Structure formats: C-alpha cells, structure tokens
C-alpha cells in the first residue's frame, strides 16, 4: 500500500511539473542543462530568401555565445520552424516549439501580420517572444502583450525617420503612399500621413495598398506617374520591393522611393541600376567606417566563406537577428534565468550599447528606442560590385521616437 501511495505521489508530481512547464511558470529546460530558443520564420514561399538569412543570423549569435561557454553555464540550442509566411501556420509552429521542443524563448518573424498571430501563442503559454524584424506599430501598441519584446523599430519610427530625411535633405513636396495591404503597410500608411504634416507645403497626391507578393506593379506605377509624385513612400520588402523598383525603371518613373528595405543585397543584385538614387532607411545599417561593424562583417564572412557572399552577407536582416539575440542574451544574463517573469523584469527599461549607439527597451511597451540611419543607393560602394548603400547619415532618436501616449498601448501614458 505504501509503495502505491509513493508511486501515486511521483506521478502527480510529474504531472504538476509538466503543467508548470507548459504554463511557462518555470523554465522548461532548467533540469537538462540547455536553453532552447524557438525560431519561427518564413523559410518557404515567396519570402524564403529573407527567412533563410534571418535563420543564419540567429545561428551565428547562438554559435558565438556557445563558443564562449554558453548562457548561464548552459549551451544554447536553436530550433527553427517554418511559418510559410502564414499566420495560422506560425501559431501552430510556435505552439509546437513551446509544448514539444520546450522552448524557453521564442524569436521571429517576417511579416507583422504573421507575428501578431504568433505572439498570441506566446501570451497563452507565458513564453517571452522576441521580435527583431516585424515593424507594425500595433505589435507593441494596440495589440501589445507583456511577453513581447521588440528589438527593431516600429512603423512609427521608420516613417518618422523617412520623413525627417526628406525634410532635411530634399525639397520634395509631392508624396505618394504605396504599401502592402497588410498590417505593416497599413500601419506605415498612417505613420507617413501623420509625419508628412512636419513638411510645410507637402501634398499627399495618392495612396494605394496592393496585395502581398504582387507580380504586376504597372497599374500602380502608372498612377504614381500621372499624379506627379516626387516621392513614393513605402515599407515594401523582398520581391514586392524589387518588383516595384524594376517597374519604376521600366515605365520611366522619376519619383524617388523611400522607406523600404532596399538594403537587401539580393534585391539590389536583381534591380541593379534601377535602384540608384532611392532612399534606404534602417536603424542598423552597416557602416564599414565603424570598427565594430567592420569586424562583425569580416568575422561573419570568414565563418561563412563557403556560402554565397551576396545572399549571405550580414547587411540585411542577418544583423538584426544577430544584434537582437545579443541583447536578449544580455537580458537573460541579468535576469539569471529564462523564467518569463524574471526576464520581463530584467529587460524592461534596460539599455544596451549597439554598434550604432545606445538603445533602450522602453518599459511600458517593450519597444526599442533607437537612432536611425539613412543612405542613398549609389553605384560605387564598399560592399558589392552592383549598386548598394552609400555613406549613411544619422537621424537622432529624439526626432523619430513615438511618444508613449501615441502608441495605442494602454500601459503607456
């Protein structure tokens, strides 16, 4: 009888611990000497090229910290799942990473609409989800949950930086918004409209939102030309940006495109001279005049010398995941644990020195506060034989930071 009671207690204890692990109240891998990072991203479909490189940036960060002895005395394991760039798939894969792979922390993913779905799984199971990529303002704004930390700026910051550049470095007055019909594009459209008010005499001469993964941009670019727009404002990325730029060139559109992710070397290798003179805006633009970033590029390329230099160059997305994970590792070290409650407490309000300057994780919305960089696409550059970014200029954080009261986040006053 006593053996039966003891056996029953063991079974009940096991069930209790399992329940705690699933709820996120204790680190799932505390007992087996490893820390699991679960990554969800687009590694198939039309945006596979981006997801593949993001994965490489994450792996580089993990390999680097493991080579230094690991994190909290444990080796870090990266488990990657494919979102297929679909919200429902991302939720399913995030849930699998938490329940089956016992992920201590989640990271991802391309597509704000995809991450908005994925972050609900993080909240349900009380697991911190780090976002080094998706920029829709609603992620840390109206849809905020306390398990999300974003190490990339919002559409509010991106659009403010874009308009700040045009206000300071150009005389353009006629603007046309052309974005994806998705969370990122819609949030960006609102941000562009709000920030255009800062340019005296500016005109919004057109506004369109196109389907994601669009093949034919000719009807949209024809409308841009007819409007007399001097600038196309967009947050397009991947094929949607490449096709937009190529169509501009084919139809003889003279407008400057700004706000998108044209520092993607895969896209620039494709569009070539059609990209000349367009504007790149990003907080972590690599500047080889910066010794820290120059060493990062050199070390990264040396380790990955057998891979295609253009495709796997650490200048787009790769560095965002790398730097985002470095900051996450720092927060875990200061928390002394991957326990979600402790990690949240340690990361809220924390500052970190990035190669481009000091950044802060704003406590109320878990949003990075950072300066921005802007650069034009030029023919002769330090990176590639095809056109790429020239020397960047810095846009101070005080010019682009969205005030807490304007984020749509109920915690921010």
Provide a role label for each language-model segment.
Residues 34, 38-59, 81-88, 110-111, ...:
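Extracytoplasmic "Venus flytrap"
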Residues 88, 102-207, 254-280:
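Extracytoplasmic ligand/sensor domains, especially the bilobed periplasmic-binding protein
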Residues 26-39, 68-75, 167-173:
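Immediate post-signal peptide segment of exported/extracytoplasmic ligand-binding proteins
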Residues 49-56, 70-141, 151, 210-217, ...:
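Beta-alpha junction/loop-to-helix N-cap segments that form part of ligand/metal-binding clefts
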Residues 245-322, 329-338, 387-413:
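Extracellular/periplasmic periplasmic-binding protein-like sensory domains
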Residues 31-34, 56-78, 197-200:
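Signal peptide-proximal N-terminal region
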Residues 33-35, 351-413:
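Solvent-exposed, acidic/polar segments of extracytosolic/periplasmic ligand-binding ectodomains
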Residues 1-36, 67, 407-413:
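Short, low-complexity disordered leader/linker segments with a strong preference
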């Amino acid at each position: 009888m006593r053996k039966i009671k003891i056996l029953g207690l063991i079974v009940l204890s096991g069930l209790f611990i399992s329940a705690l692990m699933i709820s996120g109240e204790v680190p799932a891998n505390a007992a087996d000497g490893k820390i699991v990072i679960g990554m969800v991203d687009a590694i198939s479909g039309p945006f596979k090229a981006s997801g593949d490189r993001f994965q490489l940036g994450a792996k580089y960060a993990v390999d680097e910290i493991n080579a230094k002895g690991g994190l909290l005395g444990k080796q870090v394991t990266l488990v990657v799942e494919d979102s297929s760039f679909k919200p429902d798939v991302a939720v399913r894969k995030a849930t699998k990473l938490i329940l089956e792979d016992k992920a201590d922390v989640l990271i991802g993913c391309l597509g704000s609409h995809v991450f908005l779905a994925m972050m609900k799984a993080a909240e349900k199971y009380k697991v911190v989800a780090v976002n080094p990529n998706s920029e829709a303002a609603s992620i840390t704004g109206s849809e905020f949950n306390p398990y999300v930390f974003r190490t990339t700026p919002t559409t509010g910051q991106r659009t403010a930086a874009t308009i700040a550049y045009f206000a300071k470095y150009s005389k353009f007055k006629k603007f046309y918004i052309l974005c994806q019909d998705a969370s990122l594009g819609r949030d960006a459209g609102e941000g562009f409209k709000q920030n255009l008010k800062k340019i005296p005499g500016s005109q919004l001469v057109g506004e369109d939102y196109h389907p994601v993964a669009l093949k034919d941009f000719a009807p949209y670019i024809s409308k841009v030309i007819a409007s007399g727009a001097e600038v196309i404002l967009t947050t397009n990325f991947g094929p949607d940006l490449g096709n937009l730029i190529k169509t501009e060139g084919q139809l003889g559109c003279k407008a400057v495109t700004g706000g998108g992710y044209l520092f993607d070397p895969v896209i620039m290798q494709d569009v070539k001279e059609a990209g000349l003179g367009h504007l790149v805006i990003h907080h972590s633009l690599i500047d080889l005049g910066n010794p820290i970033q120059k060493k990062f590029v050199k070390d990264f390329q040396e380790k990955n010398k057998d891979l295609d230099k253009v495709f796997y160059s650490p200048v787009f997305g790769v560095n965002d995941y790398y730097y985002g994970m470095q900051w996450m590792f720092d927060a875990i070290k200061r928390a002394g644990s991957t326990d979600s409650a402790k990690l949240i407490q340690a990361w809220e309000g924390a500052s970190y020195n990035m190669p481009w300057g000091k950044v802060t994780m704003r406590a109320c919305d878990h949003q990075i506060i950072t300066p921005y960089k802007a650069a034009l696409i030029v023919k002769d550059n330090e990176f590639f034989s095809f056109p790429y970014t020239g020397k960047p200029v810095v846009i101070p954080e005080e010019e682009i930071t969205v005030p807490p009261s304007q984020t749509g986040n109920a915690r921010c006053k």
